[in-house]
Amino acid sequence: ELVLNDRLIRIDKNDSMNVWYWRDWLIKTPKWVKKKISLRLDENTGYKSYRFGLNKKNYILARVVYKAHNPDWDITDSSQNNQIDHININSLDNRIENLRVLTSQHNKWNTSAKGYYKCNFTNKWRAEIRVNGKCIKIGRFTEEADARQAYLNAKEIHHKVPA
């Protein structure tokens, strides 16, 4: 159970598998007003998230799930030092073991395929990484997988995300 805006919210889940069933998931207030959760897509970034409204305020489900398991965490603080990160990069996987609080910069480092691209001029794959605002060139590769691996190796060195 969780209290938001002086309203009690009951979070139902399948405890045996610890899997949230989003399509059938309902937020229930003390008056048992059912609130549906909607899937939102940010067309600028492609970021998908589950959201719902309560008392004329919108909530991102990942933040609510994290708050339910961490009562002392401030759900209203959306500053750069208080971002919810999905460890496995799937923004729709809101299991508590997949959520952590990071700074905005650390959160941006945990993204899917980036750091390599196909160079039209050389017809090779180029890998590069940004560190403290500077672009470091890693190299050119004939195979995409090699460029990706080189980027991931550099990412492990330069982008150490705190546990």
Language-model region placement:
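Short, solvent-exposed cationic patches
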Residues: 47-54, 58, 155-161
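Short helix-coil boundary/hinge micro-motifs
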Residues: 1-49, 53-54
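Short, cationic Gly/His-enriched loop motifs
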Residues: 55-132
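A short, charged, amphipathic alpha-helix used as a generic interaction element across diverse proteins
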Residues: 142-158
